[in-house]
Curated annotation (Swiss-Prot):
Residues 1-25, 74-78, 89-99, 163-168, 235-282 are cytoplasmic. Aquaporins contain two tandem repeats each containing three membrane-spanning domains and a pore-forming loop with the signature motif Asn-Pro-Ala (NPA). The chain crosses the membrane at residues 26-46, 55-73, 100-121, 142-162, 169-188, 214-234. Aquaporins form homotetrameric transmembrane channels, with each monomer independently mediating water transport across the plasma membrane along its osmotic gradient. Unlike classical aquaporins, AQP6 is an intracellular channel with selective anion permeability, particularly for nitrate, and exhibits very low water permeability. It may also facilitate the transport of gases, such as CO2 and NH4(+), as demonstrated in vitro. InterPro entries: Aquaporin-like, Aquaporin_6, Aquaporin_transptr, MIP, MIP_CS. Residues 79-88, 193-205 dip into the membrane without crossing it. It is found in: Cytoplasmic vesicle membrane. This is Aquaporin-6.
Length: 282
C-alpha cells in the first residue's frame, strides 16, 4: 500500500478504506447468519391454534438453524451471529474493537430484517407477539437475569472450546448447535430462552414491545463476559502480552490464520500455544 502523509486526510481515508475492505464480507455474513437464525428459530415459537409448538420442537429448530448458520458463514466471519459471542471474543483478545462494533451493528440489523420477514409471512392472528422473549410471571427479573447468564455462559464456553485452534477434531457447527438446544430445553420456561440479545431485539423492535427487554441484554452479556474470562484466563490462559492485546484491540494485528474475514493485517503476530481462536482482527 502506498505511503500516505501522516496526519492528513489520506491517512484517515486509508484507514477507512482498509477497515471496510477487511470486514465488508464478514459484516454481510453476520447479517445473514443472524437474520436466518431469527427467521427460522423464532418461527418455530409461533403458536398455531392447531399445532402448539413443543419445547423439544423449538430446541431442535434452534439447534438446526444454529448449525446451518455456523456452517454457512464460518469461513467468512467466524459465525458469531450474537452480540454476546462478539463481546466474549473481544474480551478474549480474538477480535478488534472496530470489528466488534461493526459485527454487533450487522447482527442487530440482520435480526430486525429476519423478524420483519417472519412478521410479513405470518397470518395476523399468529404474529401478534412474534415470539418475543418474556419473563414468566412467577420468575423475578433477578432470576431471569441469572438464568440468561448461566445459559449464555455454557454457550460461550462451548463456542470457545469448539473454535479453539488447538482442537483437532469435532464440528463447531454441530457442537454449538447442541449447546443452543440445551439452553432452550432449560431456559424456555423461564424467559423463552434468549442467550442472544439480537434474537430478542429483532422481534421486539418489529412489534414495539420492550417489557423488561434489558434482561435479555444484561444476562447474556454478563454470561459471555464471565465465560470469556474463565476460558481465556483460567482454563486455557494464553501468552499474549499487554502490548499484543492492545494491538489486537485497536486492530493492528491479526489473530489466527483460519476462519477470518479476509483482512490484510498491518502486522501478523505468531503465538504458538496461545490458544487464539481462528479469527482475524481488523
Amino acid at each position: 500500500m502506498d505511503a500516505v502523509e501522516p496526519g492528513g486526510r489520506g491517512w484517515a481515508s486509508m484507514l477507512a478504506c482498509r477497515l471496510w475492505k477487511a470486514i465488508s464480507r464478514a459484516l454481510f455474513a453476520e447479517f445473514l447468519a443472524t437474520g436466518l437464525y431469527v427467521f427460522f428459530g423464532v418461527g418455530s415459537v409461533m403458536r398455531w391454534p392447531t399445532a402448539l409448538p413443543s419445547v423439544l420442537q423449538i430446541a431442535i429448530t434452534f439447534n438446526l438453524v444454529t448449525a446451518m448458520a455456523v456452517q454457512v458463514t464460518w469461513k467468512a466471519s467466524g459465525a458469531h451471529a450474537n452480540p454476546a459471542v462478539t463481546l466474549a471474543f473481544l474480551v478474549g483478545s480474538h477480535i478488534s474493537l472496530p470489528r466488534a462494533v461493526a459485527y454487533v451493528a450487522a447482527q442487530l440489523v440482520g435480526a430486525t430484517v429476519g423478524a420483519a420477514l417472519l412478521y410479513g409471512v405470518m397470518p395476523g392472528d399468529i404474529r401478534e407477539t412474534l415470539g418475543i422473549n418474556v419473563v414468566r410471571n412467577s420468575v423475578s427479573t433477578g432470576q431471569a437475569v441469572a438464568v440468561e447468564l448461566l445459559l449464555t455462559l455454557q454457550l460461550v464456553l462451548c463456542v470457545f472450546a469448539s473454535t479453539d485452534s488447538r482442537q483437532t477434531s469435532g464440528s463447531p457447527a454441530t457442537m454449538i448447535g447442541i449447546s443452543v438446544a440445551l439452553g432452550h430445553l432449560i431456559g424456555i420456561h423461564f424467559t423463552g430462552c434468549s442467550m442472544n440479545p439480537a434474537r430478542s431485539f429483532g422481534p421486539a423492535i418489529i412489534i414495539g414491545k420492550f417489557t423488561v427487554h434489558w434482561v435479555f441484554w444484561v444476562g447474556p452479556l454478563m454470561g459471555a463476559l464471565l465465560a470469556s474470562l474463565i476460558y481465556n484466563f483460567v482454563l486455557f490462559p494464553d501468552t499474549k502480552t499487554l502490548a499484543q492485546r492492545l494491538a489486537i484491540l485497536t486492530g493492528t494485528v491479526e489473530v489466527g490464520t483460519g476462519a477470518g474475514a479476509g483482512a490484510e493485517p498491518l502486522k501478523k503476530e505468531s503465538q504458538p500455544g496461545s490458544g487464539a481462536v481462528e479469527m482475524e482482527s481488523v
